[in-house]
């Protein structure tokens, strides 16, 4: 059996840029799944379910692929927050986060469409926000417009100035694709990124 083609089941330019760091050829597709949370679903269960669903949805387009699915949410004050989608929501999310700790949960799934084998795990990452003035929040939102980023920031850009501390095993997790975990999963499928 030949090595399956690597597929990223995501249209996120941020996830694509992260995956390019590994130097492996890949294609991407839009998994186009229903991302509605189930009543009383925990953040970890939600991202695990959606990462698996995205990876499995990619098999429609690439039936012999090795498909990566990923999903991320942030939790603040025990509530799941997602992408703000507009300026007002972004300001509200960052105002709520000011001076607090937010945990991001990123679900990562690797689905071998040839064998039906799936490996799915959740990688946490914790962000400690500085105490931010309303003017700082507005200025940041206007400069980076993080409307499609969970938690309303881009940590790979100016968003780093919002934080006092980061905690986690892989900073790539915060951007949306835990590469350390992914390389471990790929190795279990016979793909060594260092070979």
UniProtKB/Swiss-Prot annotation:
InterPro entries: ITPase-like_fam, Maf-like. GO terms for biological process: nucleotide metabolic process. Its cofactor is a divalent metal cation. GO terms for molecular function: nucleoside triphosphate diphosphatase activity. Its main location: cytoplasm. The active site is at 71 (proton acceptor). Keywords: Cytoplasm, Hydrolase, Nucleotide metabolism. It is an enzyme of class 3 (hydrolase). It catalyses: N(7)-methyl-GTP + H2O = N(7)-methyl-GMP + diphosphate + H(+). The record marks 14, 72, 156 as: Important for substrate specificity. Its EC number is 3.6.1.-. It comes from the Bacteria. SUPFAM superfamilies: ITPase-like. It is found in: Cytoplasm. One of its GO terms (cellular component) is cytoplasm. The keyword rRNA-binding does not apply. PANTHER family: 7-METHYL-GTP PYROPHOSPHATASE, BIFUNCTIONAL DTTP/UTP PYROPHOSPHATASE/METHYLTRANSFERASE PROTEIN-RELATED. Belongs to the Maf family. YceF subfamily. Nucleoside triphosphate pyrophosphatase that hydrolyzes 7-methyl-GTP (m(7)GTP). May have a dual role in cell division arrest and in preventing the incorporation of modified nucleotides into cellular nucleic acids. This is 7-methyl-GTP pyrophosphatase.
